[in-house]
Amino acid sequence: MERSKLPRYICPTLAVVLPLVLCMVVEGATTSKNDNQGEAIGYGYQVKNAKVDNSTGKSLTALLQLIRNSPVYGPDIHFLSFTASFEEDDTLRIRFTDANNRRWEIPNEVLPRPPPPPSPPPLSSLQHLPKPIPQNQPTTTVLSHPHSDLAFTLFHTTPFGFTIYRKSTHDVLFDATPIPSNPTTFLIYKDQYLQLSSSLPAQQAHLYGLGEHTKPTFQLAHNQILTLWNADIASFNRDLNLYGSHPFYMDVRSSPMVGSTHGVFLLNSNGMDVEYTGDRITYKVIGGIIDLYIFAGRTPEMVLDQYTKLIGRPAPMPYWAFGFHQCRWGYRDVNEIETVVDKYAEARIPLEVMWTDIDYMDAFKDFTLDPVHFPLDKMQQFVTKLHRNGQRYVPILDPGINTNKSYGTFIRGMQSNVFIKRNGNPYLGSVWPGPVYYPDFLDPAARSFWVDEIKRFRDILPIDGIWIDMNEASNFITSAPTPGSTLDNPPYKINNSGGRVPINSKTIPATAMHYGNVTEYNAHNLYGFLESQATREALVRPATRGPFLLSRSTFAGSGKYTAHWTGDNAARWDDLQYSIPTMLNFGLFGMPMIGADICGFAESTTEELCCRWIQLGAFYPFSRDHSARDTTHQELYLWESVAASARTVLGLRYELLPYYYTLMYDANLRGSPIARPLSFTFPDDVATYGISSQFLIGRGIMVSPVLQPGSSIVNAYSPRGNWVSLSNYTSSVSVSAGTYVSLSAPPDHINVHIHEGNIVAMQGEAMTTQAARSTPFHLLVVMSDHVASTGELFLDNGIEMDIGGPGGKWTLVRFFAESGINNLTISSEVVNRGYAMSQRWVMDKITILGLKRRVKIKEYTVQKDAGAIKVKGLGRRTSSHNQGGFFVSVISDLRQLVGQAFKLELEFEGATR
């Protein structure tokens, strides 16, 4: 809230009373002018009536009346229906709609959600409107529920306003009380211009999200415009609207309660600018409705649990998707991709999935194979060989269907009438195959068509997943606007491409029509989302195979269907660093399976850059090397230094595969990211809020990469506690409070540390995930003097679509470790043990880190069906050695079945009985 405007309030104890009652001096009409029009953008609304539903106490409805019309950006809508409702105890929904006319909003069948409470009756059925509230008697209407910490206050001022705050702290989370002299703070509601603004405490609010944009920092910088309009703009361009739209932000407060976090989501698919100045956030939307959700949190994990409960939990990914992937645009033929696979094997670098870009197609047409360079028989042999080796194959698809009249896919599409139309005919665009029509994925017939085409292709070539690209949708031409149309040329110009470029530029025109008489203007940002839905539907048939899908264009909720990569980055050191904020942002957007093109896509990479990039990229949730044609090849085996680093870091990644897969299970269960900012684990450490060069995998493994050329030192932030290096377990960082430390990082090394209090189940290194899954488990236990150590391991067949669901083909193991004065206990609990027992998975070794004394086995018991059985220690070896002030103890030759609960008691050397 702007302190300079405080005279408009007449409450003497503003700081205390504001969340409960706002006393506003109502001034005359605003004199703030729009720079271009010479008149105010709008004058706001006043409350005509407001009522809390006393039967539930969970909703409030009101009718709002326009104060005065303004012609800027078109005429205002005169009457608005307003509702505020508790969707859940921790989720408050705020909705403004036209009281008399239905407006576009995302269909419930596209993004399922609970219905809002009934709106006030339309004006035609209102017999008597209440008289205007006298301006000298401002009142409030409060919505509060005993089960929620959130409360809503509606201010009957002129113009009206509202706040959402925490009852426990009186911290205002969303403050839409207007400044009477400033129309940019008013609610404005026109057909093609909607405005909603909230003041923010600039020094206490730390905002993240509102993508997709490439930025150097994870935390949003002040004084910027964030535009949401899906566009085929290379991601090496900073601060421009890119492939996806995610109108969600998370706000972590540094006071009054440090680390208190909430989320804000505007459910709207139309183009928009979000202006963020630090002390204010303002939405400027060119259509739809205002449908705002506030998630109470109050931790970051709780916010994402609440957010993904609404938009959809992240899809489970097959186990093999966590392996290493290789791709390039420009592979000449099937012989070249076979050679690439062979050379990875010769170099002993793990390779899980081979990809092909558009090169494999016949003249770039979907669902075809180049008969000369990628003939069907050779491709079938190639995929068969991959599968025999435990490897996979994923090709690319673009949505544009070439209009060649002899092309079977086009013929069937025309017969089914499935393409987007303009002026009554299929809209003709142009992409890689030349002239194309675009399937209308809002049309059930188009979804069926797409599913059938994928089935036809999979029937001849057993692909393992699909990569969908160019689905913003991209168009190589810009069609002329329809004369006089305010859709192709809206009155408010969003900051498209950073220069208010027309929204028709290089995409489907806004006047094109979808199924159900929906305009492209309204549905544009949903195109990639809808294609992801249809493509995943195709991939779940047959249902016995876990689907994998990667999409460039995304929207809120896309994580329910697809993974994502950061798009066309460049082989630049800046892009290496930018990949971290983008990865962390997509974790917030409910898309935890995220990564960047390792070594860079555009431009030619260098040996040093590629070496440092694979060191970082090995820890992306989605880890893929991808490059553009006409650039230097960058397969990891081409430089010995890169190959050596790849063997090391991918070896560690494959050891950590059970950990990554367990994190994916948690993401599907609660919406938690796989790659996380340091602030997620350390929300009370304000210094972590601005860190964009390090990240966590899960809650306890910290990655601190080299991001500058020629550097052999990393100035890394170390939150409080003990951190042990995962490269050798022998070096550690111990700090009582968070501080920056200098870490050695020679060219072949990346710093990866595990924090005290964590237990991680690992398996052995291997060339494929299939081979890694057959190796014994190794339990890594990091002890803490302050908390018990814990960890989890989720196990299933690696391709389940209903992960952890009914049917019993899964096991969850929880691990615990705690030390006393003379002893230490490590134990496990097993949920649904039958599946793990049937697989006969074995844990062979336990490594204990962070000990201050040597230990030896005192007692070892396992849980049998008949009860706990004491096991003699014969055959089990315990070794300890001191490194860096801590002992490392290894208990080997355990042969412990993972599906069997156990308890291991260890005695400290020199302990008295």
UniProtKB/Swiss-Prot annotation:
* Active-site residues, as the UniProt record annotates them: D469, E472, D568 (proton donor)
UniProt-recorded Gene Ontology molecular function terms: alpha-1,4-glucosidase activity; carbohydrate binding
The reply on keyword Endoplasmic reticulum is no
Sugar-bearing residues?
Answer: N54, N404, N495, N517, N728, N823
Pfam family example for this protein? Glyco_hydro_31_3rd
Q: Which UniProt keywords apply?
A: Glycoprotein, Glycosidase, Hydrolase, Signal
Catalytic activity, EC: 3.2.1.20
What name does UniProt use for this protein? Alpha-glucosidase
Query: Could you tell me which species this protein originates from?
Result: Beta vulgaris (Sugar beet)
